Structures are given as structure tokens and as C-alpha cells.
Curated annotation (Swiss-Prot):
Keywords: Endoplasmic reticulum, Glycoprotein, Membrane, Sugar transport, Transmembrane, Transmembrane helix, Transport. This is UDP-galactose transporter homolog 1. The keyword Methyltransferase does not apply. GO terms for cellular component: endoplasmic reticulum membrane; Golgi membrane. It holds the Pfam family UAA.
Length: 391
């Protein structure tokens, strides 16, 4: 059952984020052209340059979808709406009561979270996660001003390493030895696949100087914050337990906080985020949507696809942890490109095929160990049931 659940989660992530990726490319790379008028018979194509606005709408949609998901999943339940949505645990008294009833400290082998007079320890971690994620996404977009998209993608392929490092450094977590092997194999394989892609005919190779030091520093900070985000999410599930916080509840609250933080940033005249003639990203986005109202169709579809995909992401995070989740997300690019090879008859270099083999070796180890863990848990469960019957 564990392996089947992992397959369902991975398949859902691949499907939804394949659609999400196509819409993201359309929004960021495809020009929008306004209808010709007497005053402007030959309108110039425009590009949507408000990534912070996109992320804000994405977070709002994700909050709504998470709320609907929780309510539908718990329909017929006797719980109050605040309990279903996990809102009652966001107060100091609520988290103390829930932790005590759920016996989080006994379940996870850790001391119960320290009770604060002013803020729930769970809410403080939600705020931290939202701030880390919001900042990381903006650093990624800013890095594209200085480095090429392939360079950023290549760096993102090594995301497993900072996630593993942050889990160990920040929260002193220990992993089974096979996890380190899987991280190494998948990272190496993805790097080989991305680094040795043959250059497309008719396109000149970019000089190494295009990847400036500023862009690489921003990219590195993006990876570090991504690793801190995933490891902190892991720590929340480990510290408070699934009886206290569920994947849907984390998705709801985290995205609501992210939407608030990013909406606030949208209204601030930050030089790095503004464009010529517009003091804020909000004014930039509003001006663009007024000129090209058809962009709303792509924005809404993009946000909806991302929100549905996040449900699968948070379920995977809750059930299997951040390392397995990031293994799925970083290999999504590889499977997408392999699909492109099959459909459009693209060619891969020998080193790329080696990278594919290395990644599949890592995935095979992960699947084998997950199956062993599932069988071991089944044996333990059967033994407990047998002992209960004898008693």
C-alpha cells in the first residue's frame, strides 16, 4: 500500500505540474499583443513581468483549494469547521490542548513544543515557512535577470542536497543510509542530464560571462531557502504529529500567510521588483491586465493547476517526507524531457542516457526500500492484531 500511495502521489504531481509548467512558460515567455487601433495600427508585443503578482494569486487559489479539500474530505464529520481547518491550533491554548490530547511528544519521541503566552508555536513555524518560501521564489525570479534559465534549472536539479543538509544542520535529523545514496544518485543523474544536453541548431551558445556572480549568489540563496523551507515543513510534522497538523491544514495556513506577505510586498516601491514607469509590481500587473485582459485566463488556469498540484505535494510531504517529495519534483523535469524525446523524436547524448540510468537506479533503490518498509510495517501491524486477539 505504501508503494501504491507513493505512485499515486508522484503521478498526481507529474500530471498537474506538467500543465502548470506549460502555463508558466506561456505567461513568462509568450508575448501578448493588443488589438490594432487607429492610434496604434501596429501594437508591439508585451511580456508579463510581474512574477510576484503571479505568486500572490497562486497562494490565494491554493488557500481556497486547500479549504475546499479539507471540508470535502471531512464531510459528515462531527468536528467544528475550525477544527477541520486546523485554525483552533493557531492559538497558544489551542496548540497546548491539541498536543496534550494527541500525545505528540510520546508519538514522535520529542518534548512537547514550548507553550508561548502570545503566539502558538505552530503558527510561528507557519509564518517562518511562508516567509522562507515567499523569499525563495522571488530570489529565483530575480536571479533570471543575471543568469540564463538553463543555468537556474541546472542548479535546481541539485535541490536534494540543500534539503538533506538543512534537515541535518537545522534539526539534527538522521536518515537511513539508503537515503544518502538516493540523494547522491538522483542529483548526479539529473545534473548529467541537464548539463550535457546537446545545443539546439541555430542557437549560439551563451558565453560563461552571462552567468554573473550576482545571479549565481541569488540562485544559491534560493536553494538554501528552499532547503530550509522543506526541512522546516518536515520538522512541523515530526514535532506536532499528524494528529495535530495535516497536509491540507498546513497548505491552507501557509498559503494564506504567504498571500498576505506577498500582497503587502506588491504595494511597496521596492527597486529590484519594480519596472520602469511603475513604482510597484501591483501597478505593473494592473496596467498589463487592463491592456491585455486575456492574460487573466492564463493567470487563473496557472493558479488553479498549481493549487491542485499543491494538494498532492503536501500529501506526499506528510506521508513520505521532504527528501522523497524533492526526489519526485526534481525528476519531473527529466520525465517531461523523456516524454518530449518519445513524442518529438529528439536525440539525447550518451552522457544524458547515463544520467537517466543513474536517476532510475536511485528511484529503484527508493522504491525497493519503501516496499520493504511497507512489508515490515504490515508484519508489525499483523503481530499487534494477533496479540490483541489473544488478550
Amino acid at each position: 500500500m505504501t508503494l501504491l500511495q507513493l505512485g499515486v502521489c508522484a503521478g498526481s504531481i507529474y500530471t498537474t505540474f506538467l500543465i502548470w509548467g506549460l502555463l508558466q512558460e506561456r505567461l513568462t515567455k509568450t508575448p501578448y499583443t493588443a488589438p490594432a487601433t487607429l492610434l496604434h495600427p501596429n501594437p508591439q508585443p508585451d511580456y508579463f513581468r510581474s512574477p510576484l503578482f503571479l505568486n500572490t494569486v497562486q497562494a490565494l487559489f491554493s488557500s481556497v483549494v486547500a479549504c475546499m479539500y479539507l471540508l470535502v474530505r471531512n464531510r459528515g464529520s462531527n468536528k467544528r469547521v475550525t477544527q477541520i481547518l486546523g485554525l483552533h491550533t493557531l492559538t497558544p491554548d489551542g496548540i497546548a490542548e491539541k498536543t496534550q490530547n494527541g500525545r505528540a511528544s510520546a508519538t514522535n519521541g520529542k518534548a512537547a513544543p514550548t507553550r508561548s503566552r502570545w503566539i502558538s508555536p505552530l503558527l510561528s513555524r507557519y509564518i517562518l515557512i511562508a516567509a522562507l518560501q515567499s523569499t525563495a521564489s522571488q530570489l529565483g525570479f530575480l536571479s533570471l535577470r543575471y543568469i540564463s534559465y538553463p543555468t537556474l534549472t541546472l542548479a535546481k536539479s541539485c535541490k536534494l542536497v540543500p534539503v538533506l543538509v538543512m534537515n541535518v544542520v537545522l534539526y539534527r535529523r538522521k536518515f537511513a543510509s539508503y537515503k544518502y545514496a538516493v540523494v547522491g544518485l538522483v542529483t548526479l543523474g539529473i545534473w548529467l542530464f541537464m548539463a550535457f544536453a546537446p545545443s539546439k541548431p541555430g542557437k549560439k551558445a551563451k558565453a560563461p560571462e552571462s552567468s554573473s556572480l550576482i545571479g549565481l549568489v541569488l540562485c544559491l540563496l534560493n536553494l538554501v531557502l528552499d532547503g530550509a523551507t522543506n526541512s522546516t515543513q518536515d520538522q512541523v510534522f515530526s514535532m506536532f504529529g499528524r494528529q495535530t497538523v495535516s497536509a491540507g491544514q498546513m497548505m491552507l495556513v501557509m498559503n494564506a500567510i504567504s498571500a498576505f506577505l506577498m500582497a503587502l510586498t506588491l504595494t511597496l516601491p521596492i527597486p529590484l521588483l519594480s519596472t520602469p514607469g511603475q513604482p510597484t509590481q501591483l501597478s505593473t500587473a494592473i496596467a498589463f491586465t487592463q491592456k491585455h485582459p486575456e492574460v487573466w485566463r492564463d493567470i487563473i488556469a496557472y493558479a488553479l493547476a498549481g493549487a491542485v498540484g499543491q494538494v498532492s505535494i503536501f500529501e506526499t510531504l506528510e506521508r513520505f517526507g521532504s527528501l522523497t517529495l524533492v526526489s519526485i519534483t526534481v525528476t519531473r523535469k527529466l520525465f517531461t524531457m523523456l516524454l518530449s524525446v518519445v513524442v518529438y523524436k529528439h536525440e539525447l547524448s550518451k552522457l544524458q542516457w547515463l544520467g537517466v540510468a543513474v536517476v532510475f537506479a536511485g528511484i529503484g533503490i527508493e522504491a525497493r526500500e519503501k516496499r520493504r518498509e511497507g512489508l515490515a510495517n504490515k508484519v508489525i501491524h499483523d503481530e499487534k492484531r494477533a496479540l490483541a486477539k489473544d488478550a
